[in-house]
Design a protein with these regions (language model features):
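Structured core of small recognition/catalytic domains
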Residues: 146, 155-204, 208-214
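Fold-core signature of tandem repeat domains
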Residues: 5-8, 21, 26-30, 40, ...
Length: 241
C-alpha cells in the first residue's frame, strides 16, 4: 500500500494577503490556529493551512502521511533528495518534515494520530482540493523517485504524465510527470465549475494567470494561478463521461 496525500500548506513572508485571496477565490472557511497559522477547511478532498514562511520565501506544498517521517527523509536523501525541514514535533498528535526532490520541488511528510488532521476528509465549504501534481524536468526520474519513496504506482497512460494510485484508500489522487513548456512545481488543484471564470476572478483579487484554460481532453480543462505571494495553485473542471 502506498502513502496518501492528506494536507496542503501555503506560505509567504506576509501571509495576511493570502487569507482573503483564497477565501474569496474558492469560498473556503478559514480558522486561525495560532498567530502565524490559519487552518483552511475546503469543500472536499483535503484541508490545508496558510502560514508565515520562516525563510521569507513563498511556498506551496502538500503533505504525505507516512508511518516514519525520519526514515522517509533518509530514504529521500538516498534517492537524490535533500532535507528541507528536519523532523519537527508540532504537538503530541502531529510531527512533520519536508524535503526537496532531485528537481528542488518541496514536499511535506506528516505523521498524525488517525482522525487528527491527517486526511480524514474536509468538512468545510467552497471548492474541493482533490488533486496533486508534480511536474519535474524528467517524468521517468520523478515517477521512479516518488514510486520508490511512497510506494505509488502509475496508470498506463502518457509516459510524460503518470496518474498516481497511492493505494491507500484515503487522501487524494494526482499525477507525476514533466512539462514540455518548462513548468516545474509540486502543488494541488481545486475542482471548480468554470476554469476561465476562476482564472479571471484570481486576477481581480491580485493574483495572476499562470496558464489556462487548457483543454486536457474532451472532458477536462485545467489552469493555474499565482497568488499574491507568487505560489502556483491549480484549478480544473471535469465533465463526467
Amino acid at each position: 500500500m502506498g502513502d496518501p496525500v492528506t494536507w496542503f500548506d501555503l506560505g509567504a513572508a506576509d501571509e495576511e494577503p493570502l487569507k482573503p485571496f483564497y477565501a474569496e477565490l474558492f469560498g473556503w472557511t478559514l480558522q486561525p490556529a495560532s498567530e502565524r497559522y490559519t487552518v483552511v477547511a475546503t469543500g472536499g478532498g483535503i484541508n490545508g493551512g496558510i502560514g508565515r514562511s520562516r525563510s521569507g520565501d513563498p511556498w506551496v506544498a502538500f503533505y504525505v502521511d507516512v508511518a516514519d517521517p525520519q526514515a522517509t527523509l533518509d530514504a529521500a536523501e538516498s534517492l537524490g533528495g535533500k532535507t528541507a525541514v528536519p523532523l519537527t514535533k508540532v504537538s503530541d498528535m502531529l510531527t512533520f518534515a519536508m524535503f526537496t526532490d532531485p528537481d528542488g520541488l518541496i514536499v511535506g511528510l506528516t505523521k498524525a494520530i488517525e482522525g487528527e488532521g491527517n486526511g480524514g476528509g474536509s468538512v468545510g465549504q467552497g471548492a474541493p482540493v482533490d488533486w496533486f501534481e508534480i511536474l519535474g524536468s524528467d517524468a521517468k526520474r520523478s515517477q521512479a523517485f516518488y514510486g520508490e519513496l511512497f510506494g505509488w504506482t502509475y496508470a498506463d497512460a502518457d509516459p510524460s504524465y503518470g496518474l498516481v494510485d497511492t493505494g491507500a484508500g484515503r487522501g487524494i489522487g494526482g499525477g507525476v510527470g514533466a512539462s514540455g513548456q518548462g513548468m516545474r512545481w509540486a502543488t494541488v488543484y481545486a475542482s471548480v465549475e468554470d476554469v476561465e471564470r476562476y482564472l479571471a476572478r484570481a486576477e481581480g483579487l491580485g493574483g495572476r494567470r499562470e496558464y489556462g484554460p487548457l483543454d486536457v481532453d474532451d472532458h477536462m480543462q485545467s489552469g493555474a494561478v499565482r497568488d499574491p505571494a507568487g505560489n502556483v495553485f491549480g484549478i480544473y473542471h471535469h465533465e463526467p463521461h
